[in-house]
Amino acid sequence: MQWQISDSERAYLRELAKKQAECAALAKSALDELIATRAREGEKLGTMILERVERMRTLVAEAAPKLPQALADYQERMATRLREAAASLDEERIRQEMGLFATRVDVAEELNRLVAHLDEVARVVGKGGAIGKRLDFLMQELNREANTLASKSVSTEITAIAVDMKLLIEQMREQVQNIE
């Protein structure tokens, strides 16, 4: 038995094939536009993130020269308190205690790690591709260092810088959520 296709069925199948081709072309066009839009958005987000990275570098550069004076001021305050509280303690012991306090509040290491993380953010953004998860991790690391900087700081200036950093990190984190 052989199947017979009527002229109307044949016309319907041709029309259906034509519609399928149109749908496929529209889907491809929409997909191409989506990819192009995401690429443009990714470039803009990358630029925004890099601007904040540069602002954070500026903040680190502002904080670094303040460290020696902040530590010296802190040591002097601690020395005065210790002398007042324990006039009977020997001067060498006070210097040792002050050294311990100074190492607890020294934030140079945090500033160095911030710079390293900022370098990595810039490298990852420049690399392109699917970088969202990597950037999210780096935002966590930056936030951790900024928190440590704020908590260890004995200077209101350095604390204010750490707060500014945290705001920039939060802005970057919001943008990173939009990156694949």
Where are these regions (language model features)?
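N-terminal intrinsically disordered, cationic/polar leader segments
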Residues: M1-E180
